[in-house]
């Protein structure tokens, strides 16, 4: 079946914003006016089409990005709704990774908020072309011009108004389209579906002329001919103006700003027009790069004729279909029933059902093309960030980077039935979200959940309870300590047990020394002449490994240690692999004591982005947390402070930073390295755990 929509007519875009700026409502209205939704879902009623997890509908925040296809003016829109909460930035990152453009929604009462800064920076990182929608113009305190100033002051970006509001707060009637120099007014009784062009109100004409001139001056800077014509007194025609604004969006020269009130159904259709006119199609953005089998860089153009390459950017568990993998097709054509290779994991997969998603409704399709965002059912191996491709032309697309989890909690199921359900549920949750990890504490047998923040883990626990009906007790958040030796130690140990009949005998001699940081555990047998027979060496290794998970300082895993078996003795009758395992365990524990084991704590690389006024307070606070300031620089008009801080001193930091900066500073942190804990910290931890 041939392609219905030319790839030039695709717009793959996301809607990004601070929590509560009206992102989901804006998406709802887009679905309503593009004819995909017959009833408008209100977020505050808990009925929004895009927010389909129970947790989202209750909390009124969007947690998982839902992908939706809609149509406007003959163009095909693939929309991704992204969360605005700081603990879910992984979702925003992976959405931006597969999108070509974005609409940044601002609350025109609040202007640019902390999380707007975070998502804007993520947009900068992936060079995503953006337009800005100043939403909630009907709200008390709405100020379109403050939004423009905020974009300059807080994002360090260049905004250009291409619309102006007519009235504000409860008098918000419509907008002035500066490109066409027409007023656009909505009729209240038609739920915003009907609007009409009108002449610009007399009292706003001067302001409109002033802002149109600013817009034209910014646009003609991008084209010498248009600039020359403008200097000769000729204003660019509408088509030329649109072409230049589009060029600005694609190059990041400036960001067009529109206005409206999604909740009051005003301004959504012109926003859709702007998406079509100014945001890029898949062929307008740089082609994706990857690496072939030989490690050479290859480029995949957005073209059906190129070899097939798609990127899995989200995994979801669907109660009806099973595992759904959301993929962006970068090149080639994908057909259901074909075999592909998961080049990231070197596994073969067969494409079963292919679905086009609309929030949580779905449509089966047989074929998908370059530029499409599709959901694939039944993939066994795929994980977020994996590449699927043509087996004849393998490629690994750029890997997504996922931050290390920084916080962990223990979870204990209340019954045997809960234990079984928990295992299945956690495997699914970990597959869906790469920033969520699960492990087992060998000592206590407890299951440990690791995540990006407290809300992140709260939501996971909530999903376990509701979706998977697991009843469990949750522990307090903990830090993952480690242990290592600091000096070389030599030990000689003999295990002897004679109790009539067959006894036990094994003697080992070890040299144990610190390994290079990050090298982990290494074992080497230097036995010559059969002092310890070969068949007993696995027993020796097993004995050492049983101690690695629980060191002698406070019972934490031992890292970066090298063990050499240099000598030993055995008995023809009484020796066995088990005897050597017991001897090695005791010898290694003795070596850890002799080698002066110390406690290591995780050190986090912390980046705080703060308005300059709060720099002194932020640095003082980081110092009080045993932080070491690595440097500062300016980003836009914000100060960026980089520091190394022990994780144990970072609990509750988000709330401190928020109150210290009136919510204007944001921070990110990720694991950097382990370092020896000071004596007082080590003593405190030993008292608690040893």
Swiss-Prot record:
GO biological process, one term: ribosome disassembly
Cellular localization per UniProt: Cytoplasm
SUPFAM superfamilies assigned: EF-G C-terminal domain-like, P-loop containing nucleoside triphosphate hydrolases, Ribosomal protein S5 domain 2-like, Translation proteins
Molecular function as annotated in GO: GTP binding; GTPase activity; guanosine tetraphosphate binding; translation elongation factor activity
Binding site for GTP: 17-24, 81-85, 135-138
Keyword GTP-binding on entry: yes
GO CC aspect terms: cytoplasm
Pfam family, one: GTP_EFTU
Residues of the tr-type G domain: 8-283
Keywords, alphabetical: Cytoplasm, Elongation factor, GTP-binding, Nucleotide-binding, Protein biosynthesis
Role, per record: Catalyzes the GTP-dependent ribosomal translocation step during translation elongation. During this step, the ribosome changes from the pre-translocational (PRE) to the post-translocational (POST) state as the newly formed A-site-bound peptidyl-tRNA and P-site-bound deacylated tRNA move to the P and E sites, respectively. Catalyzes the coordinated movement of the two tRNA molecules, the mRNA and conformational changes in the ribosome.
Family, as annotated: Belongs to the TRAFAC class translation factor GTPase superfamily. Classic translation factor GTPase family. EF-G/EF-2 subfamily.
NCBIfam families in the record: EF-G, PRK12740.1-3, PRK12740.1-5, small_GTP
Protein's name according to its UniProt entry: Elongation factor G
Species classification: Bacteria, Pseudomonadati, Pseudomonadota, Alphaproteobacteria, Hyphomicrobiales
Gene name for this UniProt entry: fusA
